[in-house]
Amino acid sequence: MEEGKRWIAVPTWRVPGRMERWHSLIKYLKYRTGDLEKVCYVPHHKVGWAWWTCSRVIFPLKGESHLEIQAYWNLTPEKGWLSSYSVRLTWYTEKFWTDVTPDCADSLIHSTYFSCFTAGEVRRAIRGEKLLSCCNYPQAHKYQVPSLQFLALVVVQQNGRPQRDNTTRKQWRRNYRRGLRVARQDGRSHKQRGSEPPAPRAYFPGVAKVLEILA
């Protein structure tokens, strides 16, 4: 008796274009700034038994857990219900795994990587002092219910105060522009800017924004 085909279905997120921006940003933050030094980057490769190709970015998280973002090429767009490109977001431990949404992936990455406001920043903001830290991953807070303290710190970070030095604000803006610019360029362009000093902290636009994920 001939055995029928067995299919394994997994949820993926459609991506409208190619993945160079995503790969370029990951390589920049891993090899240039060191913000993602612990991240494992597996370049675009062929899967032996499949017709599609993929790449993998594995984020080690707290508590022996990991977040893996797999990007797929060459799916079946002729069917009408699949894009040529898509990504899969998976959180897993040694004994358990589950697929997550882009906003959940942002929160998981922010919990381990990229700085946020420290506990003493509220008191510094009330006293009109310079903020000593800032949130370099605001996209991770987009779908959360923020506290009044966090909202106030975001306003101070974005607008600044006349009586304090706005170095933190300027640095944040530079990192913001740098993060978006790097995400749109091919990784080879970084070699041409080898004389530039690395940023002390990079800004991460967010998984959905970089990949242009279509819900």
Curated annotation (Swiss-Prot):
Its membrane topology: Peripheral membrane protein
Q: Where is it located?
A: Host cytoplasm; Host cell membrane; Virion
- Respond yes or no to whether keyword Phosphoprotein is given for this record: yes
Instruction: Share the record's PTM remark.
Output: Processed in virion by the viral protease. Highly phosphorylated on serine and threonine residues.
Residues recorded with modification Phosphoserine: 147
Residues carrying Phosphothreonine? 98
Question: Positions of the region Multimerization?
Answer: 154-167
Keywords per UniProt: AIDS, Host cell membrane, Host cytoplasm, Host membrane, Host-virus interaction, Membrane, Phosphoprotein, Ubl conjugation, Ubl conjugation pathway, Virion
- Which GO BP terms apply? viral life cycle
Per the record, its GO cellular-component terms are: host cell cytoplasm; host cell plasma membrane; membrane; virion component
Q: Name one Pfam family in it.
A: Vif
| Location of the motif HCCH motif | 110-141
> What factors induce this protein?
Expressed late during infection in a Rev-dependent manner.
Q: Where is this motif: BC-box-like motif?
A: 147-156
Task: Indicate where this protein is primarily found.
Answer: host cell
Q: Does the keyword Membrane apply?
A: yes
Q: What does this protein do?
A: Counteracts the innate antiviral activity of APOBEC3G. Forms a complex with host APOBEC3G thus preventing the entry of this lethally hypermutating enzyme into progeny virions. Functions as an adapter molecule, recruiting APOBEC3G to the ubiquitin-proteasome machinery. Targets APOBEC3G for degradation through the assembly with elongin BC complex, CUL5 and RBX1. Binds viral RNA and affects the stability of viral nucleoprotein core. May play a role in viral morphology.
Record text on subunit structure and interactions? Homomultimer; in vitro and presumably in vivo. Interacts with viral Pr55Gag precursor and human APOBEC3G. The interaction between Vif and APOBEC3G is species-specific, which may play a role in restricting the replication of HIV to humans. Forms an E3 ligase complex by interacting with human CUL5 and elongin BC complex (ELOB and ELOC).
What's noted about domains in the record? The BC-like-box motif mediates the interaction with elongin BC complex.
Q: State the similarity comment.
A: Belongs to the primate lentivirus group Vif protein family.
Q: What else is known?
A: Required for replication in 'nonpermissive' cells, including primary T-cells, macrophages and certain T-cell lines, but is dispensable for replication in 'permissive' cell lines, such as 293T cells. In nonpermissive cells, Vif-defective viruses can produce virions, but they fail to complete reverse transcription and cannot successfully infect new cells. Vif-defective viruses show catastrophic failure in reverse transcription due to APOBEC-induced mutations that initiate a DNA base repair pathway and compromise the structural integrity of the ssDNA. In the absence of Vif, the virion is morphologically abnormal.
Q: Specify the protein name.
A: Virion infectivity factor
